A protein has these predicted regions:
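Conserved, mostly hydrophobic/aromatic
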Residues: 24, 51, 80, 178, ...
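N-terminal pre-triad scaffold of radical SAM enzymes
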Residues: 46-89, 96-120
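Core AdoMet radical
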Residues: 88-202, 212-219, 241-246
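A general structural detector for well-ordered alpha-helical segments in enzyme core domains, enriched
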Residues: 107, 136-140, 144, 164, ...
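Catalytic cores of alpha/beta
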Residues: 160-168, 222-234, 291-302
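Conserved mixed alpha/beta catalytic, RNA-binding, or beta-rich assembly cores of soluble enzyme
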Residues: 212, 216-217, 226-229, 236
Length: 370
């Protein structure tokens, strides 16, 4: 009987927090951490149901889809322990220089055929500075934008000056992916070649240039639940438009190759908690979902996710886009892509979640997860 009364109290508190979020209020760290610490399956399913209500209220039943292109692979100078593209580790990751226009054109065409709104250019290097590489990057962005098939986005590492951010904006870049990866406290545990503040500085340059931010992190690197909570709060503070939630996929040769996977229900709970803290943002489930969630992949939307990375990741495989589209249909959900978006560059429906700015309105612009 005591256990049943506790469950009822938990359900009531979850409902109270949900109602407050639906009314436009924000929950604080103490309240959020209580959600992250829930462990009983009944409580987690109640939490997911509430997060689903929040998703439907703020995002409807349209799901944003995006994909990425590994535009420069391998040989990265940074020592991020989760990454197979770091030169610090011996992995089987491919290595090649920055791609020319043709692979990006093909990726854009495939994305349009699959109702994918944005294609993100991702490069394995420390970052961008003035020079020939920046010139080439800007050329690729302009070419993709001119074709008008999808919106070009990018995740190109750290930026060392306001001038670089301004040039990306002038080339036509609307969104930039730059994950915080983890909480400030945990960051040095997985990367020591640059700092948490280096990432915040980059985000500041981009925002000053008028570029929208896609920023999230990786769950399952050995961080605590409080670290996950702190990451979500930091993302709320910086005003990220889209929040990709990745789940560690341990790669042979990296320091995390033997990291134990999180239980699927812990992953779904984390997605739900992010929805409570970031109710009106695109919560995007990205890397690691196939290997970590397996048969429970479709439950991410019932846990509050409103966006999905489709197609293969940087160095690992995903399930097919056809399977993802069928998953959406089975759930009564639909992609937010519309044919006229790529042609006209505007959207008449500010509530559709497509991320394209309606006339006289500002919208959050989704981007891929990097």
């Amino acid at each position: 009987m005591t256990k049943q009364r506790v469950d009822v109290r938990n359900r009531d508190r979850i409902q109270d927090l949900c109602d407050r979020v639906l009314d436009g209020a924000s929950i604080d760290k103490e309240e959020a951490l209580w959600l992250f610490e829930l462990e009983e399956q009944a409580d987690i399913t109640d939490l997911m149901a509430a997060a689903n209500r929040i998703r439907q209220h703020f995002k409807g039943n349209r799901i944003h889809l995006c994909s990425i292109v590994n535009a420069k692979a391998g040989g990265c100078s940074e020592n991020c322990k989760f990454c197979s593209q770091s030169s610090a580790y011996q992995t089987q990751s491919p290595k090649y220089g920055f791609v020319d226009a043709e692979p990006l054109r093909q990726a854009s065409e495939e994305a349009k055929e699959n109702q994918v709104t944005a294609v993100g250019l991702v490069a394995a290097w420390k970052g961008l500075r003035e020079g020939p590489i920046l010139d080439e990057v800007c050329d690729r962005i302009r070419e993709m934008a001119a074709e008008g098939k999808v919106r070009p986005d990018a995740s190109l590492g750290l930026i060392d000056s306001q001038e670089v951010a301004n040039r990306l904006k002038d080339a036509g870049l609307e969104c930039y992916g730059h994950n915080l990866e983890s909480s400030r406290r945990f960051f040095p545990e997985h990367c020591t070649t640059h700092s948490f503040d280096d990432r915040l500085k980059t985000i500041g340059f981009l925002q000053k240039a008028g570029i929208k931010i896609c920023s999230g992190g990786i769950i399952g690197m050995g961080e605590s639940r409080e670290d996950r909570c702190d990451l979500a709060l930091e993302l709320r503070a910086i005003g990220a438009s889209v929040v990709p939630v990745n789940f560690l996929n341990p790669i042979d040769g990296t320091p995390y190759e033997n990291m134990e996977a999180l239980p699927p229900m812990e992953i779904l709970k984390t997605v739900a908690c992010f929805r409570f803290l970031l109710p009106d943002k695109e919560i995007m489930v990205a890397g690691g979902r196939t290997i970590n969630l397996r048969d429970l992949q479709s439950m991410i939307f019932m846990a509050g996710a409103s966006a999905l990375m489709v197609g293969n990741y940087l160095t690992t495989l995903n399930q097919s886009v056809d399977q993802d589209l069928q998953m959406l249909r089975d759930l009564g959900l639909s992609p937010d892509w519309k044919p006229e978006l790529a042609e006209e560059g505007s959207c008449a429906d500010s509530s559709c979640g497509c991320g394209v700015t309606p006339k006289n309105e500002e919208a959050s612009l989704p981007i891929g997860s990097f």
